[in-house]
């Protein structure tokens, strides 16, 4: 997917979406490093051999997303509900009997303040472990993603 994006800053957001949406995220060999391929050179060019892993910030970020999904019943089994949807931002809810996670993504180069009823006052971001206060709107920095687990 790194080969077809026109803005490389969207790549981590694509993975946040994949891990936040219902289903099992698929990461093809090399994608965890942001490797690019050229399909016009045929299928083998899309499956290069790597001598050693090329770990980077994207690799670390995908690892955090995987841990967040692994530890969350809502992200694995929860119902889906769209909360906020614009051309460049989305917030959706994943919910089970005992857990609610709000997945928030800002794909814009500008910050975005989302005003919506979160149904809770505080949350913990499952990606970073940082607390989030929903009071006064939720600030989404440019090119950012959050998995806010609402406190009961």
Which role fits each region the language model picked out?
Residues 1-152:
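Active-site and adjacent substrate-binding regions of carbohydrate-active enzymes
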């Amino acid at each position: 997917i790194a080969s077809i994006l026109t803005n490389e800053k969207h790549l981590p957001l694509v993975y946040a979406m994949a891990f936040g949406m219902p289903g099992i995220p698929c990461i093809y060999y090399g994608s965890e490093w942001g490797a690019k391929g050229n399909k016009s050179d045929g299928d083998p060019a899309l499956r290069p051999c790597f001598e050693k892993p090329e770990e980077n910030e994207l690799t670390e970020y995908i690892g955090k997303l995987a841990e967040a999904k692994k530890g969350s019943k809502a992200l694995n089994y929860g119902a889906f509900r769209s909360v906020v949807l614009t051309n460049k931002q989305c917030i959706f809810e994943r919910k089970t009997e005992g857990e609610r996670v709000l997945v928030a993504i800002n794909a814009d180069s500008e910050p975005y303040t989302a005003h919506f009823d979160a149904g809770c006052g505080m949350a913990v971001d499952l990606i970073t472990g940082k607390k989030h206060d929903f009071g006064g709107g939720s600030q989404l920095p440019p090119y950012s993603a959050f998995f806010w687990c609402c406190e009961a």
